[in-house]
Design a protein with these regions (language model features):
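Membrane-proximal alpha-helical signals and transmembrane carboxylates
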Residues: 1-153
Length: 153
């Protein structure tokens, strides 16, 4: 019995004194929005952080995005999914990559650094989970010169 306590103590000391493997906070990359578009047959996925993924389908493009990001990219922090009109049929493929409570917008204009702030101030009604169930019309987002305009679905 005494021997087990000694072994347990040694194991506890080894755990406490061993080097910790943490993650450099500077390498954590939480995305605010994800933009889905096409270039011919190639699906493109871009984030507000400037990361880009390409592939033959959504899963392949998102996988490429995760691999090519210079750090730990978090898509489940994304509040918004922006989709070009030609990719609207791909929205259900975003499930499992982005949380179901993310708002979905169709936009012909590519997002920029002001898009996230605009969407924070003007909330849409369409969530990814609703799109996957087909229960909600898509909200639109358009650009008029320098300003964004929300078109609720």
């Amino acid at each position: 019995m005494k021997r087990w306590w000694i072994l347990l103590g040694i194991a506890a000391m080894a755990c406490l004194l061993s080097p910790f493997q943490g993650t450099d906070v500077g390498k954590l990359r939480p995305a605010q929005w994800v933009y889905l578009s096409r270039d011919g047959e190639t699906v493109l996925v871009r984030t507000d952080l400037g990361d880009l993924g390409k592939g033959g389908g959504v899963g392949e493009a998102l996988g490429d995005l995760m691999e090519s990001a210079p750090g730990a990219l978090f898509l489940d922090t994304a509040d918004y999914i922006l989709v070009s009109p030609e990719c609207a049929d791909l929205i259900p493929n975003m499930g499992g990559w982005v949380r179901g409570a993310a708002e979905v917008y169709v936009t012909a204009a590519p997002p920029d650094e002001e898009t996230g702030a605009f969407l924070e101030a003007h909330r849409g009604k369409t969530l990814l989970r609703d799109c996957m169930l087909g229960t909600q019309a898509l909200s639109g987002l358009t650009r008029d010169g320098e300003r964004w305009i929300l078109i609720d679905g």
